[in-house]
């Protein structure tokens, strides 16, 4: 657990991140260390989930450093963008100078979240056949870069 930093400060007046688990690096799979969180309102109500992967490699260019999902009843409130801002804070603790977030080209809401959170669109990339996202049916991702 020495690699992971405290997360109690990941909150604002609108959202907070509650750590659910961490995952050590698994180099044989191309996985970097990761944090997994519930996204919650200040009263503790769970409204979604997010994760932060620490590091950079070819697999993460496609999969991204950050993933998020907001429960349907809570969508439209910019909670994902607010959670991303908190994840950026955690990424800075690890010395990351930038993070990548990717989304399916058909997911306009996620692309909008990337724009609201300050991402710079880089490209729409083809997913390699050996990537786990390809196995799950995805073929392309929009790639956004966020300077930290």
Regions found by a protein language model. Name each.
Residues 38, 51, 65, 69, ...:
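Conserved beta-strand segments that form the floor/walls of ligand-binding pockets within enzyme
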Residues 91-102:
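Conserved GNAT acetyl-CoA-binding A-motif
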Residues 68-70, 76-93, 112-116:
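Conserved acetyl-CoA-binding loop-helix of GNAT-fold acetyltransferases
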Residues 2-61:
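Acetyl-CoA-dependent GNAT
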Residues 106-123:
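Conserved active-site alpha-helix within GNAT-family acetyltransferase domains
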Residues 34-36, 138-143:
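Short hydrophobic/aromatic beta-strand or adjacent loop that forms the aromatic wall/cage
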Residues 44, 78, 95, 107:
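Conserved G/P- and acidic residue-centered "switch" motifs that form tight phosphate/ATP-binding loops
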């Amino acid at each position: 657990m020495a690699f992971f930093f405290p997360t109690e400060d990941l909150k604002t007046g609108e959202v907070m991140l509650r750590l659910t688990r961490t995952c050590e690096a698994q180099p044989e799979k191309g996985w970097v260390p990761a944090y997994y969180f519930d996204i919650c309102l200040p009263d503790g109500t769970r409204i979604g989930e997010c994760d932060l992967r620490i590091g950079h490699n070819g697999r993460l260019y496609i999969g991204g450093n950050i993933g998020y999902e907001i429960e349907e009843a809570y969508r439209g409130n910019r909670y994902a963008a607010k959670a991303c801002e908190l994840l950026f804070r955690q990424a800075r603790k690890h010395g990351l100078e930038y993070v990548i977030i990717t989304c399916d080209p058909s997911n306009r809401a996620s692309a909008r979240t990337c724009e609201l959170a300050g991402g710079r669109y880089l490209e729409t990339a083809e997913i390699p056949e050996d990537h786990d996202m390809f196995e799950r049916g995805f073929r392309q991702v929009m790639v956004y870069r966020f300077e930290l």
